[in-house]
Amino acid sequence: MGAALRRHGWSYLFVLPTFALFVVFTLLPVVQAFALSLQSARIASSEWVGLQNFVTLAEDPVFRQALGNTVLYSLVVVAAQLTLALVVASLIQPLGRKSQTFYRALFYLPLVNSAILVAMVWRWIFNPNPYGLANTVLGAVGFEPLRWIGSSDEALAAVILSAVLTIPGGGVVLYSAAMGSLPRELYEAAEVEGAGAFTKWWYITVPLLKPTTLYLLVVYTILAFQVFERVYVMTNGGGPNNATITIVQLVYSTAFQFGRYGLASAMAVVLFIMAVAVAVVQFRSLRSDVEY
């Protein structure tokens, strides 16, 4: 042990700053959130209440609505973004190297924009007045304008649609790079057997991309659970009758508008447990021993 420490001591020293930042800015806040979730914590006082905050959440219709909205948003958006990223990457893969580089940059470019700015653009598109872009297009083809984010029945659908139509550039780049490393021998063997383009894509490309798909699935799910700025900007923090409220939005308002830090921490703990549980299920379902 002593010899190993002397041999690798410098390595530990280089890792130490990153580990310290992780402890201070990630691990300690998580521990503090778990501790606060068991207290009736406000700005000037704190009282131990055990699991009462979680009981309050179970009985709160607004939290149940936020939970349902978060789950629905995540299911639709994650499935759509994974599919879009895979399809777009598959379409640009047969192109030449320069064309691939151009399209990868083109689809990745929106990621460098501010999420708030992107949400503001979508708010203008789905503006409920007749001058919103979506209603202008509907009017041009003879349809009546919709209320979109101004309606409790349509607001969540508009938010989900805005996320779905935002092609995930990061996924396109990762899928495209992974496709470039797939063994050509498998495709050549399939061509000898008379396999068509779709057959090769479905039975060779998609299965071999399972590690990349698993990574993107976990990342996209966590990001979907954490959706905040899109809802906050497009629907003013929840929309009509809390139609678009999500768990993170409710955590924000509960903590920083009403000062109920204990209850907000309980919501954050529920979201954390959800994310971990879903990630475990995803890893168990999609983990693969594929090597190439």
Residue spans of the language-model regions?
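Short, Lys/Arg-rich, polar N-terminal cytosolic tail immediately upstream
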Residues: 1-6
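A structural signal for multi-pass alpha-helical bundles of membrane permease subunits
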Residues: 7-292
